[in-house]
């Protein structure tokens, strides 16, 4: 019944997601490299007549890149989106969208002047009707073709530089699956050659900002599709979990009774078909995923390689990540040490902060643990657990931002892997967003987390917490300095004592020093610290 109502509502709302706007994929658009569609409100490009925006040249960053991708001019995602477009809508004020027809995140109303803060909640705190509504919304998205966006099924070169467009329709849910595939796919170098060391959303600084935007766009799309402006993606708090407690038919699906790799027939998602999961097949044909169904969701949680991922992350692991003061370090990739991003992503140990190629922890641990569709990077968003998992990862990112209060300059401006510099535009989003735009508090983007609302981020304790953590990290140095100081003090005290004993015979009693009894200043200093 609920699904029937949602289908009726569908046609009342204009949808808007992310990637190639349907209005911008004609040969004329591609050859002129312009994507400035009219806004329906006044039918002018970018809503210019109403002051919403205007068609502008795209200004690309020329900051140097890291050495991980040693090619130029071979991948459509380089200097995004310049291979396809060099002019797009630049929106004014609080307007946003490929035609400036939407509001920026956190703003609402016909003129985008109303501020609102939505709250993402723990999935276990949802009532049964709220939970069922969430599943119904996802199912509706899975069965609704995007009216605004299409996906390319060939490279720009295969389209003969735009003269022969190659695009397919796709449903709204799979549109986002395709985007996650496209941003992380290998580079096709021609012939049978590929380059694997490239990813515009993982293994480098943009991992957290990119997925933050990804969830916001997904959330916004569901809001528009259903007309439910209060919709938010719930999160799964997996800290200290001993098993996949959301892998039941009541929630994200239990195991099939006869095939442990499939979902239970009683699950909401057992009939779902996945897309974009056959990376090696696409690579061998030098082709892109075209959105064709490729079989059912697969998941066998806990039956994974336990030598690589011995357990799910603990509260202590999360707290260690949050204690790291550097967002990024060194090579700014999966070999980075003491990097909050690399540790949270799961390429560095949550015990030491040292990169460890033999282990998958934190964020990566959940993907490996699911032992199925979600375990492959390119196709992982097929599994709706992806949404709940990444919502919680984003909440940890938010905790770090609130605790350390970094300036935007903390996000690397240059020398990060391709696509990850601060001013780089995020692949494959249109409208355009820069990585640094999402290195800010979630509250500035219009959302919060229920479990973070209980603490006051402006309290004195939270304000000084990061400074206390820094002090704890230099404790060994302080201890060494104190020991040296103690030795020097003892020598001085001995010298003074000798002098005093020498003078004690010469001075009246009332003028003798009032020496304290033995007192452990060092212990006192330790206890205060």
UniProtKB/Swiss-Prot annotation:
Q: Does the keyword Signal apply?
A: yes
> Which EC numbers does the record give?
1.14.18.1
GO MF terms, alphabetically ordered: copper ion binding; identical protein binding; protein homodimerization activity; tyrosinase activity
Q: Which reaction does it catalyse?
A: 2 L-dopa + O2 = 2 L-dopaquinone + 2 H2O; L-tyrosine + O2 = L-dopaquinone + H2O; 2 5,6-dihydroxyindole-2-carboxylate + O2 = 2 indole-5,6-quinone-2-carboxylate + 2 H2O
- The answer to keyword Signal applying to this record is yes
Q: What inducers act on this gene?
A: Increased expression after UVB irradiation.
- Annotated consequence of substituting residue 422 to Q: In OCA1A and OCA1B; temperature sensitive variant
Q: Where is the signal peptide?
A: 1-18
Q: Which residues cross the membrane?
A: 477-497
One Gene Ontology cellular component annotation held by this UniProt entry: lysosome
Cofactor binding, note field: Binds 2 copper ions per subunit.
The record's annotation in Pfam families points to: Tyrosinase
Membrane-topology annotation of the record:
Single-pass type I membrane protein
| Positions in the Cytoplasmic compartment | 498-529
User: Which compartment or compartments is the protein found in?
Assistant: Melanosome membrane; Melanosome
**BP-aspect Gene Ontology terms:** cell population proliferation; eye pigment biosynthetic process; melanin biosynthetic process; melanin biosynthetic process from tyrosine; pigmentation; response to blue light; response to cAMP; response to UV
Q: Where on this chain does Cu cation B bind?
A: 363, 367, 390
PTM comment text: Glycosylated.
Q: How does it assemble?
A: Forms an OPN3-dependent complex with DCT in response to blue light in melanocytes.
Of which family is this protein a member? Belongs to the tyrosinase family.
Which disorder does the record name?
A: Albinism, oculocutaneous, 1A: An autosomal recessive disorder in which the biosynthesis of melanin pigment is absent in skin, hair, and eyes. It is characterized by complete lack of tyrosinase activity due to production of an inactive enzyme. Patients present with a life-long absence of melanin pigment after birth, and manifest increased sensitivity to ultraviolet radiation with predisposition to skin cancer. Visual anomalies include decreased acuity, nystagmus, strabismus and photophobia. Albinism, oculocutaneous, 1B: An autosomal recessive disorder in which the biosynthesis of melanin pigment is reduced in skin, hair, and eyes. It is characterized by partial lack of tyrosinase activity. Patients have white hair at birth that rapidly turns yellow or blond. They manifest the development of minimal-to-moderate amounts of cutaneous and ocular pigment. Some patients may have with white hair in the warmer areas (scalp and axilla) and progressively darker hair in the cooler areas (extremities). This variant phenotype is due to a loss of tyrosinase activity above 35-37 degrees C.
Its biological purpose is as follows: This is a copper-containing oxidase that functions in the formation of pigments such as melanins and other polyphenolic compounds. Catalyzes the initial and rate limiting step in the cascade of reactions leading to melanin production from tyrosine. In addition to hydroxylating tyrosine to DOPA (3,4-dihydroxyphenylalanine), also catalyzes the oxidation of DOPA to DOPA-quinone, and possibly the oxidation of DHI (5,6-dihydroxyindole) to indole-5,6 quinone.
- Name the UniProt record assigns to this protein: Tyrosinase
Taxonomic source organism: Homo sapiens (Human)
Task: Name the gene behind this protein.
Answer: TYR
